[in-house]
Amino acid sequence: MTGPGMTMPLDRSPGFGVYIHWPFCAAKCPYCDFNSHVRHQPVDQERFAAAFEAELATMRERTGPREVTSIFLGGGTPSLMKPETVARVLDAVAKNWTVPDGIEVTLEANPSSVEAERFRGYRAAGVNRVSLGVQALNDKDLRFLGRLHNVDEALHAIGLAREIFPRLSFDLIYARPGQTPEAWAAELEQAIGHAADHLSLYQLTIEEGTPFHALHAAKKFAIPDNDHAADLYALTQEITSAHGLPAYEISNHARPGAESRHNLTYWRYGEYVGVGPGAHGRFVENGRRTVTIAERMPETWANLVEAKGHGVTGGEILTRSEEADEFLLMGLRLAEGIDLSRYEAFSGRGLSSARLSVLQGEGLVAPIGNARLRATPAGMIVLDAVVADLAR
């Protein structure tokens, strides 16, 4: 058993994760299409903590006894939660399933000075990994992205997080309007210099229904075209690899052993319970993989939980074919690729050797020994098309 704050051995077992969704934000970022909500009155954290406890108990009834491999508090902005609320939620997870000492417990946080003041409380509650939504390291782009912090606050939060938590990750968004390769290289080098052991690096995308979608459609700003974005992606791989943070997934980079155990559960097609407004879960129930989808509106979700013990309003039981397709889509995002025998167990058949031969000839996929298959760097860029071809 590992000690508090240490990383678990990163074997390839898919795992069983618990995801908690805190849906509230201080402000809605213009690029964000996540289930997040702004409230101008204080949130009743006591009510939501009790609702999390109740829904976790209901999920335990559905999953049966399990050993948890990771816990992730996402959002929204979980760093708006009081440390006491976080402690209640983590205690509730431990009451319902086996939680070994030292498993990864991540909390997403914004780097504003107000939220950083809560870091020691989160650590005392049991959080051992923080993921900071830095997004940019210059004030002009932070304002463009609608962030409430500035660069000085971000650097202060990074330093404080390094001091308090055993593990730290932070996010950056690139392929921003007017961003040159030289500017991105300098910013990325600066980020790596702050000694995070994990970086999540996302290209700016325009999501339907967001303010950025309307502004982009009105030609108020432009993002890099596909060729320029591909060049920035290639530059990202080059710089991170040179500094010992290779991509272990399309957008995620880590020093060996510092990969996100929770996110690996998703990509390795493990099981996870989703609790909270808008949360999704995928776990095996009565021998079949079941999808759960919770009510998105926070207050409506809480009403449902208080009435019947959960806020799940949608879901399905996946067919074997759907499981196989999801396994491909998630697993080929990883540098380690997929276990071909596991795909066959899901689908009842192997991948088409003819299609594999064509994709290998095009340099889009490559075998790892006789047992695994991975997407190449070129294949990662067009992964949706590669998966669609393999799944036919």
Please name every model-derived segment.
Residues 23-36:
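Local cysteine-cluster metal-coordination motifs and their immediate loop/turn environment
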Residues 361-370:
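A short, conserved structural fragment
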Residues 18-22:
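Short active-site neighborhood of thiol/selenol oxidoreductases, capturing the structured segment around
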Residues 340, 367, 382-383:
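Short active-site-adjacent structural elements
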Residues 378-392:
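Short, amphipathic alpha-helical interaction segments positioned at domain boundaries
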Residues 371-376:
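Minor-groove-contacting beta-hairpin "wing" of winged helix-turn-helix DNA-binding domains
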Residues 2-17, 35-62, 66-349:
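C-terminal scaffold of the Radical SAM
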Residues 347-361:
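Short amphipathic alpha-helical interaction segments
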